[in-house]
């Protein structure tokens, strides 16, 4: 566990909800798939962590590190590579503050799929637009979800339910662009009625709808993972459809692999000399995992999309 190695897992675990059972079904079909943590002989199949809590824990850890300096809120305005280092210009969000010029041996971009940093680095991406959106929110359910996760496929998309604290459930509702626009503009009661209709009564009657947000869905894959002095990790390297819920885990593996590659050269006191070697090794180790998971995720999306036509 990477968070255990960082010494922050216990804080994250306190605010997380374990998933012990996963139930996958398709509307209108009799069969379903069921996975249990006991059968798999693991403590949990996964954990649901509130993004805000995860961010707070990690931010607190960063603030306590004397060798880490944060510039926030700033964004990268320009980037240039030289033979021995790179130059990064930071632009403040606050107009009263001045630009900051940084010189570094390496830039690690963990900026997400849509940050625009790819263009500054000169890295192109392949993008597949699924013409779908994900609406994310939370509800109360009459039947407690009790550490179970559900994924329900139907003719136009899918609905996933994940356990939260206090008998609340998070949902991720994937649906076509034109339908998502309609659903975002409905009243809470109308939204709950449609959500209930597509998911069914497995968790009983739904109520007390929280805030909902919408994200467009696509597959984004960088055509290369690094330049001479910059490297991509997480969604900056691959932005996946949430159908398999593997995007965050893929990003964690990127960070763990890059850390190992860097650490190996640091202990040999050859980091500055071997940056090219580090980045080539990182790409060689990560590309097979990226390729396998992007093809798998894209295949699932296309499989269920073909069933809807």
Question: For each predicted feature, which ranges?
Answer:
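Glycine-rich FAD cofactor-binding loop and adjacent beta-loop-alpha segment at the N-terminus
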Residues: 1-19
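Conserved FAD-binding catalytic core of PHBH/FMO-like flavoproteins
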Residues: 3, 93, 99-101, 106-205, ...
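Conserved N-terminal helical subregion
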Residues: 15-120, 128-133
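Short glycine/proline- and charge-enriched loop/turn segments
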Residues: 35-42, 175, 297-300
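A general structural signal for well-ordered alpha-helical segments in protein cores
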Residues: 51-55, 132, 136, 191-192, ...
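Pyridoxal 5′-phosphate
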Residues: 83-84, 145, 251
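FAD/FMN-dependent oxidoreductases across multiple families
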Residues: 182-275
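C-terminal helical "tail/cap" subdomain of flavin- and related membrane-associated enzymes
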Residues: 260-309
């Amino acid at each position: 566990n990477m968070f255990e190695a960082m010494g922050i897992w216990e804080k994250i675990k306190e605010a997380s909800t374990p998933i012990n059972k996963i139930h996958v079904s398709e509307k209108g079909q009799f069969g379903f798939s069921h996975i249990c943590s006991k059968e798999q002989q693991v403590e949990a199949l996964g954990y649901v962590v509130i993004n805000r809590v995860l961010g707070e824990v990690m931010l607190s850890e960063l603030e306590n590190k004397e060798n880490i300096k944060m510039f926030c809120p700033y964004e990268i305005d320009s980037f240039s590579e030289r033979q021995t280092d790179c130059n990064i210009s930071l632009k403040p969000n606050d107009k009263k503050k001045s630009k900051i010029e940084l010189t570094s041996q390496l830039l690690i971009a963990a900026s997400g799929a849509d940050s625009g940093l790819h263009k500054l680095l000169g890295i192109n991406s392949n993008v597949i637009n699924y013409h779908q959106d994900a609406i994310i929110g939370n509800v109360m359910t009459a039947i407690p979800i009790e550490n179970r996760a559900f994924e329900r496929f139907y003719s136009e998309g899918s609905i996933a339910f994940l356990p939260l604290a206090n008998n609340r459930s998070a949902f991720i509702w994937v649906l076509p662009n034109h339908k998502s626009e309609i659903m975002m503009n409905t009243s809470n009661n109308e939204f709950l009625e449609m959500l209930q209709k597509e998911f069914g009564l497995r968790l009983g009657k739904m109520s007390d709808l929280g805030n909902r947000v919408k994200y467009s869905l696509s597959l984004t894959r960088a055509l290369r993972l690094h330049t001479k002095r910059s490297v991509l990790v997480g969604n900056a390297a691959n932005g996946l459809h949430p159908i398999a819920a593997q995007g965050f885990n893929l990003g964690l593996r990127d960070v763990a692999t890059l850390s190992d590659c860097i650490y190996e050269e640091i202990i040999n006191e050859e980091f500055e000399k071997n940056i090219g070697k580090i980045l080539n090794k990182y790409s060689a180790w990560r590309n097979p995992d990226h390729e396998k998971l992007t093809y798998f995720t894209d295949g699932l999306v296309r499989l269920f999309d073909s069933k809807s036509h």
